[in-house]
């Protein structure tokens, strides 16, 4: 028999003579196919089915010789199996003989002894086959009792077939349980929806009856009081009128009869009128004096018998940074105590400024191109113009989409799929859904869905549309984002993130309740947007009445049109005014410093108008804002006032709203933003845009499973989007902090789609839940990398979400119902086994807020670190997060507690909302609530059940991952940074300056075999350094001779 290498060489040599070419993969394919065939004719038939070989003559002879040469495994019976078969045969043979009636008892004893020895042997075998073989033993014993003679029946089956039958039975049973669970979820949703509607109708009727009854009772009780109040008001008014009449009458009499002698009666009447007038004046003066004294004296607080007001710290929830109330009080006191100099009319004088920057500090820009607009340039808006409030309808009519309303509605009516191209600010997002609503697309209970890639955009746009329609947010217009749903039964316009629309496919695969689906900001090519494209394309073929609108702000709409079977493109002119593009003469070494210098340079040299600066993330934005504020303080009154306003996703809502407020007179506003201001937000008043040319992008390495958020150059499409922000209200300027050559040669045309640089575990789980099994041939706009898709399938199989055939299991179906990462879902499901679902829900909620629990003010770093250390518990960072939330809950969810412990109240409140939603979903996935009562071992085991994929152990060279053997490091902020435990579990692996493990947990290696015996082997978890080495003394060179 030839060796595998020799056989492969022989096949390659023969292929030269048969086909005239030879290739290693072809040879391996032929050898593998021959090994799987049971006969030479079957091998020849398989080769003939490929339609690549002419199996006549030499080719057929080659196939026959290859089949004879290929080695095959001989079916060798295992010793244990042979012993079992012999024992079974002996047992059947003993049962078949009955010589004497008196020998029944001894025969039964023999049978019992043989059965007991057979049972002992079976205990040593694999536990997977135990149940089936016990059933076979019972069947055999029943046959032996019933039959007194006869030949032995052959019931033995090969081991491999036995194993396959067991696996197939378990798979079919799991599929039945999965389908039953899905049906229960659908029925529960249906019942809940019907009950809600019935309850709401009944409740509305009862509320109306109660209001009518209360109105009648209140009217009867309030009429006397209202009469008294009206009488008092009338008397006060009559008193003033009578007093005025009396004064006028006295003035007339004094003027007419001042020189005339009056009778005694007339003199008494005049004296009486004067006395009445004086008393009325004294009464009025006494009342005014009483009011004045009442405002200056102290009054005891009155008892409030109504509903008590909320605590002050909860009212100030969205007050920005912790301690905001204290800071405002200090500023008010300091402002009142400070002495100010200068004339009072100094503010009305026209200030005169001069360039305060040194010549070597300025940055030289070169004007290169101009983006043309479709309107004549007008004067920049002054502060007085910015303060003028236009009506909402006038604003709607001024948007670029308004003149094309009828044409757009006609195009939507004539085509099922329509691609809409229009720059940000043209009115696509806010106006088109309203046009459809006015046209009647929401009749008969239908709804309109509009997706947004960002949560901030979905919330702000929904609020704006509700304001324009004159309805309350949450009624006819609402939004739905992850862990927050602001909709009701009356909602017909739903703004949602694209991920939320994906989740609606689980309960409504055909989107039957929607008449129009609008995918907005499609040019951003987020992960969920690309998945939506493939799903909506299939739904549109199934539902011809469904309207699909794809809105994009870039010129790259041909890709979308081709994908949707050459759908028509409707273009809306967006840029109203021209924009001048300026490039630097030379590259800038530090773009952050260049941004600060350029902002001050624009501030002192350019006409009025606000500035928009694009930076990569929160850290850079805060650093730039601090540098700008510091330099403005040093320059003092040499420059005009400069308002520095940041905008990023984690910023509190009230601070985000400040960027939309009008700029005060005589000042200039500079907005420092991430790429969220490229397309998702439109800020009025922006004239100047500063573009460093960088952005943050998430990348994913499927071989190591590591995500990294790196600063990379932006694409040309993003650069053009940023420049377009300057031409919304007047002719603008865009200053790019890179050269024109870099723009032409170093920037990519478009941004790499997110589906090609991120993990696909959630996506694969969702598609499998929707019944889409052939992921390789799914209709992606841009297919993801093969390795990423393969790793996602491998992880889901390891987590138990998929079986060996790639089908969704019951656990996988439950995991798909939870809107979190698959590993986090598995951790929540495993918490039921370890009776710690209460604690696991808290850990999952805290892990969902993106490492933004603690904060470190630059002036209180030591205090913040000490406060963080006070939360440390033995075991790891997950228990620290659990401890933080538990103490916060014990304090009554107080914001003051967060301020004192340097914890971000906004993040904690979001974690509470996430936990409440996950707790509500536990009933949906049929997991009961339980608590471990402080037994953190069970909590750590439940976390290990979900994150056994992310493990590392300590070696002599540091930490290495168990499977990939990649060097990793504990993050310095971790509670285990200085302890260095032997085995670790981490939440995520992030590449920054090093490969850091974030949120680590100390575990034991035996737990991995307990929760994932299918993934780890005992040999992998052995500690090579724990073995004792033989004691041996080395010899010197002289001793060795």
UniProtKB/Swiss-Prot annotation:
Instruction: Give yes or no: UniProt keyword Transmembrane.
Output: no
Where is it made, tissue-wise? Answer: Expressed in the spleen, thyroid and testis. Also expressed in the brain and cerebellum.
Residues covered by the Helicase C-terminal domain: 598-771
Q: Please give a single GO biological process term from the UniProt record.
A: RNA splicing
Q: Indicate which residues form the motif DEAH box.
A: 520-523
Bias (Basic and acidic residues) occurs at 166-207
Changing residue 520 to A does what?
A: Impairs pre-mRNA splicing activity
Which spans does this entry mark as compositional bias, Basic residues? Answer: 119-130
Q: Where does ATP bind?
A: 422-429
Summarizing the annotation, the consequence of altering residue 523 to A is: No loss of pre-mRNA splicing activity
Location of the protein in the cell: Nucleus; Nucleus, Nucleoplasm; Cytoplasm
- Where in this protein does the record say Phosphoserine is found? 103, 106-107, 160
GO: which molecular function terms? ATP binding; ATP hydrolysis activity; helicase activity; molecular adaptor activity; pattern recognition receptor activity; RNA binding; RNA helicase activity; ubiquitin binding
Keywords, in A-Z order: ATP-binding, Cytoplasm, Disease variant, Helicase, Hydrolase, Immunity, Innate immunity, mRNA processing, mRNA splicing, Neuropathy, Nucleotide-binding, Nucleus, Phosphoprotein, Spliceosome
- Documented effect of changing residue 428 to A: Impairs pre-mRNA splicing activity
Q: Does the keyword Nucleus apply?
A: yes
Residue ranges of every copy of the Helicase ATP-binding domain listed in the record? 409-573
Q: Which ranges are annotated Polar residues under compositional bias?
A: 381-391
Q: Which disease is it linked to?
A: Neuromuscular oculoauditory syndrome: An autosomal dominant neuromuscular disorder characterized by variable features including myopathy, neuropathy, hypotonia, joint contractures, growth delay, chorioretinal lacunae, sensorineuronal deafness, agenesis of the corpus callosum, and seizures.
Q: How does it assemble?
A: Component of pre-catalytic spliceosome complexes. Component of the minor spliceosome, which splices U12-type introns. Interacts with GPKOW. Interacts with TRIM6. Interacts with RIGI.
Concerning its family, UniProt says: Belongs to the DEAD box helicase family. DEAH subfamily. DDX16/PRP8 sub-subfamily.
Q: Per its UniProt record, what PANTHER family does this chain match? A: ATP-DEPENDENT RNA HELICASE, PRE-MRNA-SPLICING FACTOR ATP-DEPENDENT RNA HELICASE DHX16
- The protein in question is named Pre-mRNA-splicing factor ATP-dependent RNA helicase DHX16
């Amino acid at each position: 028999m030839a060796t595998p290498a020799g056989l492969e060489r022989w096949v390659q040599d023969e292929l030269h003579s048969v086909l005239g070419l030879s290739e290693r993969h072809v040879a391996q394919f032929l050898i593998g196919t021959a090994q799987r065939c049971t006969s030479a004719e079957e091998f020849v038939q398989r080769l003939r089915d490929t339609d690549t070989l002419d199996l006549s003559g030499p080719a057929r002879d080659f196939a026959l010789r290859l089949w004879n040469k290929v080695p095959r495994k001989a079916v060798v019976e295992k010793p244990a199996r042979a012993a079992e078969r012999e024992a079974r045969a002996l047992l059947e043979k003993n049962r078949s003989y009955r010589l004497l009636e008196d020998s029944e008892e001894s025969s039964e004893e023999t049978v019992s002894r043989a059965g007991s020895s057979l049972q002992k042997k079976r205990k040593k075998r694999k536990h997977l086959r135990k149940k089936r073989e016990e059933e076979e033993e019972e069947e055999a014993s029943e046959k032996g009792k019933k039959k007194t003679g006869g030949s032995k029946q052959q019931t033995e089956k090969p081991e491999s077939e036995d194993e396959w039958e067991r696996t197939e039975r378990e798979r079919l049973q799991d599929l039945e349980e999965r389908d039953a669970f899905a049906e229960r979820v659908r029925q529960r949703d249906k019942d809940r929806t019907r009950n809600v509607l019935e309850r709401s109708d009944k409740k509305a009727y009862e509320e109306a009856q109660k209001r009518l009854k209360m109105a009648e009772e209140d009217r009867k009780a309030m009429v006397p009081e209202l009469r008294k109040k009206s009488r008092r008001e009338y008397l006060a008014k009559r008193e003033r009128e009578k007093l005025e009449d009396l004064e006028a009458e006295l003035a007339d009499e004094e003027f007419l009869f001042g020189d005339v002698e009056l009778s005694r009666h007339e003199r008494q009447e005049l004296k009486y009128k004067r006395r009445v007038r004086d008393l009325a004046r004294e009464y009025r003066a006494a009342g005014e004096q009483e009011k004045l004294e009442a405002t200056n004296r102290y009054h005891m607080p009155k008892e409030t018998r109504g509903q008590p007001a909320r605590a002050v710290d909860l009212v100030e929830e969205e007050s920005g940074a912790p301690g905001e109330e204290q800071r405002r009080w200090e500023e008010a006191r300091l402002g009142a105590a400070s002495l100010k100099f200068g004339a009072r009319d100094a503010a009305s004088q026209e200030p005169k400024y001069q360039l305060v920057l040194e010549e070597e500090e300025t940055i030289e820009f070169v004007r290169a191109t101009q983006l043309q607009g479709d309107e004549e340039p007008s004067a920049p808006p002054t502060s007085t113009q910015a303060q003028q409030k236009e009506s909402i309808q006038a604003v709607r009519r001024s948007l670029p989409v308004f003149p094309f309303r009828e044409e757009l509605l006609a195009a939507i009516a004539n085509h099922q799929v329509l691609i809409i191209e229009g720059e940000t600010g043209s009115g696509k997002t806010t106006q088109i859904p309203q046009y459809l609503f006015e046209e009647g697309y929401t009749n008969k209970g239908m709804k309109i869905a509009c997706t947004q890639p960002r949560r901030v955009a979905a919330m702000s746009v929904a609020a704006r549309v509700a304001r324009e329609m004159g309805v309350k947010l949450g009624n006819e217009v609402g939004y739905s984002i992850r862990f927050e749903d602001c909709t009701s039964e009356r909602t017909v316009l739903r703004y949602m993130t694209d991920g939320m629309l994906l989740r609606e496919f689980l309960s409504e695969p055909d989107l039957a309740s929607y008449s129009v689906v609008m995918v907005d900001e499609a040019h951003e090519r987020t992960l969920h947007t690309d998945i939506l494209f493939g799903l909506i394309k299939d739904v549109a073929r199934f539902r011809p009445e469904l309207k699909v609108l794809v809105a994009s702000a870039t010129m790259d709409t041909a890709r979308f049109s081709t994908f949707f079977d050459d759908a028509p493109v409707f273009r809306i002119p967006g840029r109203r005014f021209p924009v001048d593009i300026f490039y630097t003469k030379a590259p800038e070494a530090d773009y952050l410093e260049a941004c600060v210098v350029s902002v001050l340079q624009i501030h002192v040299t350019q006409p009025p108008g606000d500035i928009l600066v694009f930076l990569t993330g929160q850290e850079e934005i805060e650093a730039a804002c601090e540098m700008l504020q510091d330099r403005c303080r040093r320059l003092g009154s040499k420059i005009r006032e400069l308002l520095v306003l940041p905008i990023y996703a984690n910023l509190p809502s009230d601070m985000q709203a400040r960027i939309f407020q009008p700029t005060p007179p005589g000042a200039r506003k500079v907005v420092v933003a991430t790429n969220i201001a490229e397309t998702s937000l439109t800020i009025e008043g922006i004239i100047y845009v500063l573009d460093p040319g960088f952005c943050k992008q998430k990348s994913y390495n499927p071989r190591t499973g590591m995500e990294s958020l790196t600063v990379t150059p932006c694409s040309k499409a993003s650069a053009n989007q940023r420049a377009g922000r300057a031409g919304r209200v007047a002719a603008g300027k865009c200053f790019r902090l890179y050269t024109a050559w870099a723009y032409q040669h170093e920037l990519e045309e478009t941004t790499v789609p997110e589906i090609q640089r991120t993990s696909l575990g959630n996506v694969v789980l969702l598609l499998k839940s929707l019944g889409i099994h052939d992921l390789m041939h799914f209709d992606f706009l841009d297919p993801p990398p093969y390795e990423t898709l393969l790793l996602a399938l491998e992880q889901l199989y390891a987590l138990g979400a998929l079986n060996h055939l790639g089908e969704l299991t019951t656990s996988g179906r439950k995991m798909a119902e939870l809107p979190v990462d698959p590993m986090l879902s598995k951790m929540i499901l495993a918490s039921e086994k370890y009776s710690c679902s209460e604690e696991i829900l808290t850990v999952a909620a805290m892990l969902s807020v993106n490492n933004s629990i603690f904060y470190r003010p630059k002036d209180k770093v030591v205090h913040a670190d000490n406060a963080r250390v006070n939360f440390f518990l033995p075991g790891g960072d997950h228990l620290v997060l659990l401890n933080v939330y538990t103490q916060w809950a014990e304090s009554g969810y107080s914001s003051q507690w967060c301020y004192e412990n340097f914890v971000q109240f906004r993040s904690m409140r979001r974690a509470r909302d996430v936990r409440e939603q996950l707790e509500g979903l536990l009933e949906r996935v049929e997991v009961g609530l339980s608590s471990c009562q402080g037994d953190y071992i069970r909590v750590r085991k439940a976390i290990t059940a979900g994150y056994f994929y992310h493990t590392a152990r300590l070696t002599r060279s540091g930490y290495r991952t168990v499977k990939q053997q990649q060097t990793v490091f504990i993050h310095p902020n971790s509670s285990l940074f200085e302890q260095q435990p032997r085995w670790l579990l981490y939440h995520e692996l992030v590449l920054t300056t090093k490969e850091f493990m974030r949120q680590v947990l100390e575990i034991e290696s035996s737990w991995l075999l307990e929760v994932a015996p299918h993934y780890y082997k005992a040999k992998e978890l052995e500690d090579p350094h724990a073995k004792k080495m033989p004691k041996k003394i080395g010899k010197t060179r002289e001793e060795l001779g």
